[in-house]
Amino acid sequence: MTTRAPLRIALAIATALACVLALAACGAKQDVTSAPATKRFTVMLDWFPNADHAALYSAIADGDFRAVGLEVQPVVPSEAVEPLKQLAAGKIDMAISYEPELLLARDEGLKLVSIGALVQRPLTSIIALPGQHVSTVKDLAGKRVGTAGISYQAAELHTALQHAGVNPAKVQEVNVGFNLVPAMLSGKVAATLGGFWNYEAIQLQIMHKHPVVIPVNEVGVPNYDELVLVVRADEARSDGVDLRAFMQALTRGERAVRANPAAAAKLVQAANPSLEPKLQLESIERTLPAALPAQAGKPFGYQDPTQWAAFGRWMFQQGLLKSDPDATGLPPFTNEFLPGQGI
């Protein structure tokens, strides 16, 4: 595993946190209690509506967003790379994306910032079917592993292999796009890296395939927030009231999901009728522990500064980023808009 940041990085984190407070200085100091009118607020999902978005749909259905003055409208992207591009272009108000994608976008100069974590740890996993005789990462030696062709997934695979003492040259990486499950079922690859333990793994279990599932953060990849809520940095300075209201309402939505996962699954199903109901409910139930911070007393959405620093440093060391995120000035995230986190 990657070790903790040395003292200079810890100092950089402290400086970054000070910048975070300045970043949101224009935001509300107290949680929103009521609002007489509503303002349209467009949120582009990271992918099609699914269990990962249950809190969002619950907050919409229960009127939590309307209660704080927001008329939230989810938008489905045409491709996975679209949300952050649309956000940077000013065409949407918020994007649900991935911590690695946000760091890549910022490295290219996009002034974006995460205001909350929707899923607090990696969902990305190495998945294999029993017939391939893969029970540990070491068993991948000499085999073909499928990925979606995403740069940081290749780096995650290499890190996992090196962590297990396997020469990456002994493993053939195959780009199977988003056809991860078909590639395993057909035997095209012995395993995949890119599927989620709360989705593709459950899908295979429902098919009685009994997959082996190895989350990447358990085999050498630093922990990171799989899904984050991203806004433009300028809006984080000027629209603090709306962002605080959004997070307050979303927190209520998360509590509703936790209280009644079955009802939340029906809302997700209504948003995307093509989904398999059993898969959505099981996915919601298994994802619930990952929706809250590991640190006791921290609110829903909390982002760990040490964790972000370690993962950003890992991406830089892997050659995925041109600059170390700790040295770029504007922090990649802020916790300022979470309920109870204002000053």
Predicted regions mapped to residue ranges:
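Bacterial N-terminal signal peptides that target proteins for export
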Residues: 2-14
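C-terminal motif of bacterial Sec signal peptides marking the signal peptidase cleavage site
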Residues: 21-25
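Bacterial signal peptide processing site
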Residues: 27-29
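Short, glycine-/small- and polar/acidic-enriched structural segments
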Residues: 32-177, 181-198, 213-215
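Pocket-lining segment of extracytoplasmic ligand-binding domains
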Residues: 100, 179-182, 188-274
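Short, surface-exposed acidic
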Residues: 168-172, 273-285, 322-330
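Secondary-structure end/capping motifs
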Residues: 238-318
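Conserved C-terminal helix/tail region of periplasmic/extracytoplasmic solute-binding proteins
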Residues: 308-343
